[in-house]
Amino acid sequence: MVKHSKGYRTRTRKLLTKNVRERGAVPRLSLLMEEFKEGDYVVIKINPSVHKGMPHRRYHGKVGVIQGKRGKAYIVRVTLGDKEKVIIVRPEHLAKFNGIKNG
């Protein structure tokens, strides 16, 4: 028997794949230039072609609040179950949240 690997990107075969039309290494420039202010709600949307500043797969699709900035990356507060987590994510993996946030 072969031992099961437990790397950082395990179980991401479908999660970290792009649509055929979206393939390519370079993200849109507008995506990289997007600025977020403290208190903004954002969705963590992992871009698999950019490995820098990529959060763990468990945070994909979660809504968080911008707490601040660290270099080019943002400090995001995310609720995971009953705990609050603080993660550092680059803007390539963030999108503005357009829905209504209760709370």
Curated annotation (Swiss-Prot):
Disulphide connectivity of cysteines: none
Family: Belongs to the eukaryotic ribosomal protein eL21 family.
Source organism: Sulfurisphaera tokodaii (strain DSM 16993 / JCM 10545 / NBRC 100140 / 7) (Sulfolobus tokodaii)
InterPro entries assigned to the protein according to its UniProt record, in alphabetical order: Ribosomal_eL21, Ribosomal_eL21_arc, Ribosomal_eL21_CS, Ribosomal_eL21_sf, Translation_prot_SH3-like_sf
GO MF: structural constituent of ribosome
Name this polypeptide is given: Large ribosomal subunit protein eL21
GO CC, alphabetical: ribonucleoprotein complex; ribosome
Pfam family, one: Ribosomal_L21e
Keyword Cell inner membrane: no
Domain of life of the source: Archaea
GO biological process: translation
Keywords carried by this UniProt record: Ribonucleoprotein, Ribosomal protein
